[in-house]
Amino acid sequence: MTLLETFSRPSISASDRAERLTAAGSAWGERIEADVANAQLTYRVRGSGEGSVVSRITAGKHVFLVDEPGALAGDDSAASPVEYALGALISCQIVVYRLYAQALDIRVDEIDVRAEGDLDVRRLFGIEESVRAGFGDIRLTVTLTGPESDDRYQELKAAVDAHCPVLDLFTNPTPVTVTVNKG
């Protein structure tokens, strides 16, 4: 069973989406104007190992599994960590495209995003230390439908590229501190 078999997507009209996006933008603007410290968010996610290489991830009230295919010692019971990473990039792109389409008054009827990432597993398995452990290249294809000109959609792309948090995470170095505790 996949998560999609138990998930029902709420339907929303374009006008309801526009209202939500506008309200959220206004509310955040007011919070930040009142105190710039309100702009800082800390996300907390927890994970625990199960089975061969499965991870059970808890993010607030949401729980999901992460696994690997058999060739990487997994049971292929869920998407892999790098597939979730690409999924996070795709979902953030969709959110920011919606947000900036609304802000720039650019009509987007439908959005479809596809991602491909190239990963050289030699570093993962300790075969070659000179190659990168993560993706060597990622390709995103964003397909937008609607009545706008190509120039308007390129304007939207530029805004999304400049403001997408997960794209920023992939394209710029982010300090990461790892602490190991004995339990």
Place the predicted regions along the sequence by residue.
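Alpha-helical metal-binding/catalytic segments enriched in His/Glu/Asp
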Residues: 88-93
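Aromatic- and glycine-enriched beta-alpha-beta binding-site module
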Residues: 94-98
